[in-house]
Design a protein with these regions (language model features):
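Single conserved hydrophobic/aromatic residue that forms the stacking wall/gate
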Residues: 2-8, 12
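Transmembrane helix boundary and interhelical loop/hinge segments in multi-pass membrane proteins
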Residues: 36-40, 62-83
Length: 226
């Protein structure tokens, strides 16, 4: 797979390492951060859980290898298309790479949260929301990658760093994090952290299911015609 041979260079290695590093930083200074957040947002309980969840989602959004994975095939795309497998199976393999190399590193900061956050109903829902976001990010990135594939690049950096699809996926991930945190600080805190996280995870999974269905049907057809 072209993604494995090219995409996982220094750029993606650094992005993957950001998640475990953030977990180590949480163990080191997480207690201080949680105390500070609780002091600043005294009247808005659960902010520590939601904002730390937001931080992990924002970092995970930087690991966008699924987005350029189709474009990185370049003129050798015909090799993937000529394999005795369905187009959807090729796309599914790209999704699995993104999920494995994002969800597994994300378990490090999530596990570290369990040591610094109080054990409440919100804690397991932080895990659920982060993993739901990672699935959403992978499906969104691959959807953009298929819809805006560029197979005529002259430098491997073009589909990785100079692609509109990558830009949309990256800034879309950050926008998601901003809206997620902003809604909680605005009105969501009235629901409580657990209820808010549960609703956010459910909505995220619903949108992910729609993107997944598009990839499996129209996305696979479009990939076969590139």
């Amino acid at each position: 797979d072209c993604l494995l041979s090219r995409g996982l260079g220094d750029v993606y290695k650094r992005q993957i390492l950001l998640l475990p590093i953030s977990g180590i930083l949480l163990l080191w200074k997480g207690g201080t951060v949680v105390s500070l957040l609780n002091e600043v947002f005294t009247s808005q309980s659960g902010c520590a859980e939601v904002l730390l969840c937001t931080g992990v989602c924002a970092i995970a959004s930087m690991n966008d290898m699924a987005t350029p994975s189709v474009s990185l095939e370049g003129k050798s795309l015909w090799l993937a298309q000529s394999l005795p497998v369905k187009p959807w199976q090729v796309l599914r393999a790209k999704l699995k790479v993104q999920l494995a190399l994002t969800a597994l590193p994300a378990l490090v900061p999530l596990a570290c949260m369990a040591f610094i956050l109080p054990v409440t109903a919100a804690l397991p829902l932080v895990f659920a929301e982060v993993l739901a976001y990672i699935a959403f990010s992978a499906c969104l990135g691959l959807t953009l990658g298929v819809a805006r594939a560029n197979l005529t690049w002259t430098s491997e950096l073009m589909p990785i760093k100079q692609s509109l699809a990558v830009t949309i996926a990256l800034f879309g991930g950050w926008l998601y994090a901003i809206v997620f945190a902003g809604l909680y600080l605005w009105q969501g805190w009235k629901l409580g952290a657990a209820a808010y996280l549960a609703i956010a995870a459910a909505v995220t999974l619903a949108v992910t299911a729609l993107l997944f269905r598009w990839l499996k049907t129209k996305g696979a057809q479009r990939f076969a015609m590139l």
